[in-house]
């Protein structure tokens, strides 16, 4: 089964959207959740995926080596972005979609969570948070998803690179 670049980019987007309500928050003692700050550090941290955990995050039917080669090829073609410095051979790294897609998703996630009463100082109980997280992910997908699909269509090559 051939996996296209489009499918990989959309898998990165889906992983980002599903994780955002959890990684844009802090988990506190007493099973409470509060918003993380809305600065650049937390935006990067919340929207990046570690190359070591790519298989679990992306859930693509690719081997370990093949998924790594394909992600690196997308980075080389500037379809994905490396967070932080460029990795040396054999090192793990963090990758993500460009900031023009992830920053609006991060900001919208925080705005929606504020709508549920969560702030940096007002916490929500962890019990029942999965339902809130799913609603937030769905809302982010419906609002920012069309921009991502447009980006993916622009990025998709007519001739896919097979490594």
Q: What kind of region is each of these model predictions?
A:
Residues 84-93:
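Short, Lys/Arg-rich nucleic-acid/phosphate-binding segment
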Residues 61-76:
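Short amphipathic alpha-helical interaction segments
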Residues 75-85:
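A short, conserved structural fragment
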Residues 21-57:
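Short acidic, hydrophobic short linear motifs in intrinsically disordered regions
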Residues 7-12, 31:
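Short alpha-helical "packing" element that flanks the helix-turn-helix/winged-helix DNA-binding module
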Residues 1, 157-163:
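Short intrinsically disordered terminal tails
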Residues 2-6, 18-22:
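Short helix-coil-helix linker/hinge
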